Amino acid sequence: MTTELCTYTRNACDIARRTGVERIELCAAPLEGGTTPSAGLIHYARSLPGLRLSVMIRPRGGDFLYTDDEVALMAEEIRLAREYGADGVVFGLLTPDGEVDETRTAQLVREAEGMEVTFHRAFDMTRDPLRALEAAVRSGCRRVLTSGGRNTAQEGIETLRALAAQAAGRIEIMAGSGVGPSNARLLAATRVDALHFSARRERESGMRFRNPRVSMGGCAGVPEYTLTDADESVVRQILAELG
């Protein structure tokens, strides 16, 4: 069972290295569900020994229906990820009707030749996950990251089981969303190939002065003084559950 830690910070990368997680998915912007990380963070993650590195390729938050210009930007980000030594890239593209965009996905898979391609949880926004799996196979993806089309992997466990059976070794199924110590073994029993988790914890900002009249994102609901990182103890508990 391969383990992958979703990482947004240098500290989370260090936790992955210390605990023995096999692969990291490197992202920015957790409140957006993950976007392309900074060059500096990619460079740092690549410097750590013993970790396989997959880089998120997502130019913005929101939906997964991209313009031609956005796809061109994603292709450039894939080229840069290769230059920095990434082992893989992570992306997902959909059609307006909720299907995998096979044409554009295959285009970016070709751009990523020599690297592993993960089709991310855009997969869970498709109309039919079993049909979407075949589209991901045809597009040349190495794996899909999925919660079984539900908010959490535990809620989607029966679909995960069906996806693992349908994949039949043609493509890897990686379960993610809400994976923790309490359900890691249960999810592993579905015969998926990998588990993806963030072991997320939040901590309060150290700022003593907080201007209540300003919201940097223009949205008062965004927790500007709450910082998100990985919790090393939770990572270790998950790994212990998996043996």
Where does each model-flagged region fall?
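Glycine-rich phosphate-binding active-site loops on the catalytic face of alpha/beta enzymes
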Residues: 23-35, 80, 84-96, 141-154, ...
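Hydrophobic, well-structured mid-protein blocks that either form specific transmembrane helices
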Residues: 86-142
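Catalytic cores of alpha/beta
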Residues: 11-15, 65-77, 124-139, 163-165, ...
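Active-site mouth loops of central-metabolism enzymes
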Residues: 1-9, 57-75, 94, 117-129
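Alpha-helix-loop-beta-strand connector modules within alpha/beta enzyme cores
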Residues: 34-61, 100-122, 155-181, 216-243
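Hydrophobic faces of well-ordered beta-strands that scaffold small-molecule active sites
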Residues: 3-7, 24-26, 53-57, 89-91, ...
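Active-site-proximal loop/turn and secondary-structure-junction residues that shape catalytic pockets
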Residues: 9-11, 28-30, 57-61, 95-97, ...
